[in-house]
């Protein structure tokens, strides 16, 4: 993975101000690089390498796993939901890889700001498109309510996405997505008490999905474990890498719930009113 001799790496104090967002990661910062220099950093050790590969390898796996395990031929008119689900699973790790790979670009803060916005758009997409099949299946037998719920959640997601894009800090970005999480919990609650429908085993997957995502966000905001040992987790095992792994698990739980849900919706006959 890391087999080239890279440039002289910087410490936290010497890195550009826009990259000084974690004061507990003390070393391993790449110097300002050209586009080709950023690509070359795939092959030498630095403090973003783990972030790049955790989501890069996950993206390669999702590119195979998600489309191949989606039962396209059985979805019928709900095939568009399979498409939105694939986008929801693939865009976040792709945006994350681009963000972490090119964040040291010599274009400086303006380029970094655009990359951060791209990364936030990926998070917003998984929160938005990822929930549409869940809402669709939960309200499968309430056709009068389903369109309003889908449009309402989409509008809420637009507000959450804007707040995340304009948030001044990591904790503010996490709070921006809280409204979407709250709306999903209402949907899960409706399903849990019998007011909603869906495949029997999907709800636990969705609960694990949001639990993993929340845990990852909290670990990232708390800067753990590097807060307990500044400099000890500069390259491996820091909070952002842990968040990446938890987010991969969250997407896998989403996929594990959506596939049986869509199959259930395709074959289930709602009782007459």
Curated annotation (Swiss-Prot):
<feature type="transmembrane region" description="Helical">
    <location>
        <begin position="52"/>
        <end position="72"/>
    </location>
</feature>
<feature type="transmembrane region" description="Helical">
    <location>
        <begin position="115"/>
        <end position="135"/>
    </location>
</feature>
<comment type="subunit">
    <text>Interacts with CERS2 and CERS5; the interaction regulates CERS2 and CERS5 stabilities and activities and is inhibited in presence of ceramides.</text>
</comment>
<comment type="similarity">
    <text>Belongs to the ADIPOR family.</text>
</comment>
<feature type="transmembrane region" description="Helical">
    <location>
        <begin position="245"/>
        <end position="265"/>
    </location>
</feature>
<dbReference type="GO" id="GO:0060090">
    <property type="term" value="F:molecular adaptor activity"/>
</dbReference>
<keyword id="KW-0812">Transmembrane</keyword>
<keyword id="KW-1133">Transmembrane helix</keyword>
<feature type="transmembrane region" description="Helical">
    <location>
        <begin position="185"/>
        <end position="205"/>
    </location>
</feature>
<dbReference type="GO" id="GO:2000303">
    <property type="term" value="P:regulation of ceramide biosynthetic process"/>
</dbReference>
<comment type="function">
    <text>Plays a role in maintaining adipose tissue function through the regulation of ceramide levels. Mediates the stability of ceramide synthetases, CERS2 and CERS5, and their activities.</text>
</comment>
<dbReference type="GO" id="GO:0050821">
    <property type="term" value="P:protein stabilization"/>
</dbReference>
<feature type="transmembrane region" description="Helical">
    <location>
        <begin position="79"/>
        <end position="99"/>
    </location>
</feature>
<dbReference type="GO" id="GO:0000139">
    <property type="term" value="C:Golgi membrane"/>
</dbReference>
<protein>
    <recommendedName>
        <fullName>Progestin and adipoQ receptor family member 4</fullName>
    </recommendedName>
</protein>
<keyword id="KW-0472">Membrane</keyword>
<dbReference type="InterPro" id="IPR004254">
    <property type="entry name" value="AdipoR/HlyIII-related"/>
</dbReference>
<keyword id="KW-0333">Golgi apparatus</keyword>
<dbReference type="Pfam" id="PF03006">
    <property type="entry name" value="HlyIII"/>
</dbReference>
């Amino acid at each position: 993975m890391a087999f080239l001799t890279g440039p002289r790496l910087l410490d936290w104090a010497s890195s550009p101000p826009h990259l000084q967002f974690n004061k507990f990661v003390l070393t391993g910062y790449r110097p300002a690089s050209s586009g080709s220099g950023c690509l070359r950093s795939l092959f030498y050790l630095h403090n973003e390498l783990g972030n790049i590969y955790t989501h890069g390898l996950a993206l390669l796996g999702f590119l195979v796993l998600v489309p191949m395990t989606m039962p396209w031929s059985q979805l019928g008119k709900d095939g568009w939901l399979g498409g939105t689900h694939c986008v929801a699973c693939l865009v976040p790790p792709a945006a994350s890889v681009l963000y972490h790979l090119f964040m040291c670009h010599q274009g400086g803060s303006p380029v970094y700001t655009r990359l951060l916005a791209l990364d936030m758009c990926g998070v917003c997409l998984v929160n938005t498109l990822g929930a549409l099949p869940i809402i669709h299946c939960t309200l499968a037998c309430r056709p009068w309510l389903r369109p309003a719920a889908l449009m309402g959640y989409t509008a809420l997601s637009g507000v959450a996405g804007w707040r995340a894009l304009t948030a001044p800090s990591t904790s503010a970005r996490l709070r921006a997505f809280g409204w979407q999480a709250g709306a999903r919990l209402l949907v899960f609650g409706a399903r849990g008490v019998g007011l909603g429908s869906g495949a029997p085993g999907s709800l636990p997957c969705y609960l694990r999905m949001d639990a993993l995502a929340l845990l990852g966000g909290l670990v990232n905001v708390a800067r753990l474990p590097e807060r307990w040992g500044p400099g000890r987790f500069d390259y491996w095992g820091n909070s952002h890498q842990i968040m990446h792994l938890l987010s991969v698990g969250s997407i896998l739980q989403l996929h594990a719930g959506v596939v049986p849900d869509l199959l259930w919706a395709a074959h289930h006959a709602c009782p007459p009113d």
